[in-house]
Amino acid sequence: MSGKGKVHGGKGKSSDSAKASTSHSARAGLQFPVGRIKRYLKRSAQNKVRVGSKSAIYLTAVLEYLTAEVLELAGNAAKDLKVKRITPRHLQLAIRGDEELDNLIKATIAYGGVLPHINKALLLKVEKKKQQK
């Protein structure tokens, strides 16, 4: 005998003080799934490159921020048109209305329509006619 008294097997804390497991998203304070993003990164990495957990958290935070930004602008566009549901048209108006998002998102949005655009030369003629009257 080693003389150390009763020895229980295993390492760590006793079972009565075991805490519940928390997700990576909860620890990072995010709504988007960090574990899923990490899995996608690992799957798409070439030559079995190692993917750090902080890179998945950072990418998830960026995706969550961009989504929140687009949804906020689209919600404002829907509110301006006095409707309660965001449609692809509202997303189109929100993205094309913001210069930075327009540069970032070059994709075509299905059923988004087109932005109304009137050439400045045509606007000047209308304003001159109004001033003459």
From Swiss-Prot:
* Predominant cellular place of this UniProt entry's protein: nucleus
- Residues bearing the modification N6-acetyllysine: K4, K11, K13
What name does the UniProt record give this protein?
Answer: Histone H2A.Z
One Pfam family per UniProt: Histone_H2A_C
Write down which residues bear the modification named N-acetylserine: S2
The alphabetized list of GO BP terms reads:
CENP-A eviction from euchromatin; nuclear-transcribed mRNA catabolic process, non-stop decay; regulation of transcription by RNA polymerase II; silent mating-type cassette heterochromatin formation; transcription elongation by RNA polymerase II
Task: Give GO cellular component annotations, separated by semicolons.
Answer: euchromatin; nucleosome; nucleus
InterPro entries tied to this protein: Histone-fold, Histone_H2A, Histone_H2A/H2B/H3, Histone_H2A_C, Histone_H2A_CS
Bias (Basic residues) ranges: 1-11
